[in-house]
Amino acid sequence: MKLRFWGVRGSFPVPGNLTARYGGNTSCVEVRCADNSHPDAPRLILDAGTGLRRLGKEMMQSEFAEGTGTAHLLVSHTHWDHIQGLPFFAPLYQAGNRFHVYARQRDDTHLRTVFALQSDNPYFPVPFEAAAADLEFTELSDDARFNIGPVQVRCTRLNHPWIAIAFRLDYEGASV
């Protein structure tokens, strides 16, 4: 598997010269199957922090610009620094694209509602309903196990304020 770190900061983005080496965006990691030769090799995205905006710009140079892209977004938890990039994610507004969104089930509200509320007036000028891509939300238990194509995903609860889970990804003998 190949990883690309689009955002590694916590709590809030910190742009500037002091963060140039590792970047100033919040949590977003792209995981690709090593050679993408498997016909079902998925594009995986871990968390939707501000790094998601830059990833989205790059994705719009591929099939996502034509509305034929598919990706899987695994969200560890819905604190602001892990979801604040979603309203700025260009592929989300391209009809035909498909996004499967996975996160820990919450007791207080549905996952789709959490994402919609951050784009609600007066917080953001574009409502979540303007997203033209096809979105599928899957709410997970702490110990969920499932496959995304040839990638096995295992979840475990984290010791973190509120509700958070970690994802272990296994593909052809490699693990992340």
Please name every model-derived segment.
Residues M1-V176:
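Binuclear metal-dependent hydrolase catalytic cores
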